[in-house]
Amino acid sequence: MCEFNVILNGKVQFKDVIYSKVEGDNVVVKNILGEGKEFKNCKIVEVDVPNTRLVLSALKP
């Protein structure tokens, strides 16, 4: 199985992510334990499967 690390501003913000969804200007993720986190005013800029990275970027104001 492929679990991702969520990267924002060059730092790991959330680990073991198996689900992600864009909801408007937010990105919602869930990990293998079912715990969730919402990243407000962000977008997905890269999905790197070999390196298990889901890279987010803040939306410009």
Where are these regions (language model features)?
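A generic local structural motif
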Residues: 14-15, 31, 41-42
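C-terminal structural segments of small proteins and small subunits
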Residues: 4, 36-61
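N-terminal acidic leader/helix
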Residues: 1-26
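Flexible glycine-/small-residue-rich
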Residues: 8, 31, 58
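Structural recognition of beta-strand segments within beta-rich domains
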Residues: 20-21, 28-31, 36-38
